[in-house]
Amino acid sequence: MTHEFTESYDVIVIGAGHAGVEASLATSRMGCKTLLATINLDMLAFMPCNPSIGGSAKGIVVREIDALGGEMGKNIDKTYIQMKMLNTGKGPAVRALRAQADKSLYAREMKHTVEKQANLTLRQTMIDDILVEDGRVVGVLTATGQKFAAKAVVVTTGTALRGEIILGELKYSSGPNNSLASVTLADNLKKLGLEIGRFKTGTPPRVKASSINYDQTEIQPGDDKPNHFSFMSKDADYLKDQIPCWLTYTNQTSHDIINQNLYRAPMFSGIVKGVGPRYCPSIEDKIVRFADKERHQLFLEPEGRDTEEVYVQGLSTSLPEDVQKDLIHSIKGLEKAEMMRTGYAIEYDIVLPHQLRATLETKLISGLFTAGQTNGTSGYEEAAGQGLIAGINAALKVQGKSELILKRSDAYIGVMIDDLVTKGTLEPYRLLTSRAEYRLILRHDNADMRLTEIGRDIGLVDDERWKAFEIKKNQFDNELKRLNSIKLKPVKATNDRVQELGFKPLTDAMIAKEFMRRPEIDYATAVSFVGPAAEDLDAKIIELLETEIKYEGYIRKALDQVAKMKRMEEKRIPANIDWDAIDSIATEARQKFKKINPETIGQASRISGVNPADISILMIYLEGNGKAHRKY
């Protein structure tokens, strides 16, 4: 079929949420002429649910996005109202940063960034179809009948795909926050042959700040110590005038109200059909699943400086409006609270992610990529991370360059994508530190060390950032080398000082790095014995030094495991492999292999239901029939 295109682009990104923004900025910055199409320009980078960025695992993803040259970290550093480091009492592998966002300012700043970006056109239009010829993307069709040519298309439609809002017995077609749903595109993705799933998520009510009795709640302030998501942000710019959050709880009265109205709850009445998130359940789901709990935490989170709206985190619900009001008024501090927006549930279509390659390109259609909630994930950060990788790979494909695949040992983003394409997901996927087997080397403090060079190689890290990275890396390397070369001797003067500090005296000579391995010895104490570095070190370098030195043994073991897995990842599986021709593989394994079509032995070994014997048989088969090569 011959198409008459009115405009032509290298890459078209459909949807301007957190995934779409990162995808379009990446492609345009890599030199591709890009169109970012959105149903509503006023909802670019909008936060339809929680007004925050980061948190456990997610905060590390934001730093990874930043290290690769993405925008989310920079944008939240310009627009937060509170910053807090989580899990400070735990090990370094699980520490992560979280920021309360001024949600309207966050969206405005991101829109400004997109509008001024070279090679990037921003357009309010609805895309109804993906145009495909001979198994390859050639463009898109708008709702008004316009056809735009493209060499690659990235679908980042969030919860808009056949979205339906549910509130009590009310159910109507809608995207998030009463925006338009994308129904025709959902129909046409299915017609293209993609397998479609149906998920559900929800959001809590918003209450008016001036109607809250804060005296009945517990204040939750931000941190005084400077922290940032972007490695380019300066401590001098750290916000002093932060806005606190507040903690309150449900109670028995709250639970009684919910239990008495479960028959009206869409989750239990049969109105909701989609699968909801395990790690962010609705309050009615929590009351039923955890009936023995006397109360549940609720955090009152301001949505910005210039609004009265307060997000009641932990109270996600689709109960009828009258029940929501009674529920709010049963909570300490909210007895007279004015509900400004009701909570609601939203159901939406997803592209089942086992149909994707690790580049986030669909296996079925060349040049078609998907990212974000479209792939079955939850969360702005997960979406942004996928959007960045999809955008990078769309640009690389257009330019005829080698693809970028982040491994599980490279980044949390790599863990997430591998989980999605290898295991799929039966519910909205959320990143957790427990999903990462190499989490000790995927920390928040070393994201730039892990990924900045990759960002530089693909063209997303500019000269200013690269210079700053080189300075930091050289300072780190030089100080580590110095600490590994200086010896502390067990002489009287040294041991007198050691004992004055309440520490165990030295019995043998010890290099400074070994001395720092003692749990009670931090960097400042160590250099008080051996003298300071040749130049002043930033607090972030000191944090990195302490972690790398104190956990060196564990880190080395993790790196040994990575090396073993790398050998598995290097063993490729031909794309044209005949799974039925492999004798002795278990039926379940054969079915999974056919469904997922793994690209490497490493990926095959991580598929649920595949055991080591199946992998051994597969490897023997490939060694005897290894002449075929995977083609993309």
Swiss-Prot record:
Query: What keywords does the record list, in alphabetical order?
Result: Cytoplasm, FAD, Flavoprotein, NAD, tRNA processing
Name of the protein in question: tRNA uridine 5-carboxymethylaminomethyl modification enzyme MnmG
- NCBIfam families per the record? mnmG_gidA
**What's the superkingdom here?**
Bacteria
Complex formation: Homodimer. Heterotetramer of two MnmE and two MnmG subunits.
Which family does the record assign? Belongs to the MnmG family.
Cell compartments where the protein resides: Cytoplasm
Q: Please list which residues make up the signal peptide.
A: none
The intrachain disulfides are none
Q: What species is given as this protein's source?
A: Streptococcus pyogenes serotype M6 (strain ATCC BAA-946 / MGAS10394)
Per the record, the coiled-coil ranges are none
Q: What is its main location?
A: cytoplasm
User: Which cofactors is this protein said to need?
Assistant: FAD
Record SUPFAM superfamilies: FAD/NAD(P)-binding domain
Give a short account of what the protein does: NAD-binding protein involved in the addition of a carboxymethylaminomethyl (cmnm) group at the wobble position (U34) of certain tRNAs, forming tRNA-cmnm(5)s(2)U34.
Give the record's GO CC terms: cytosol
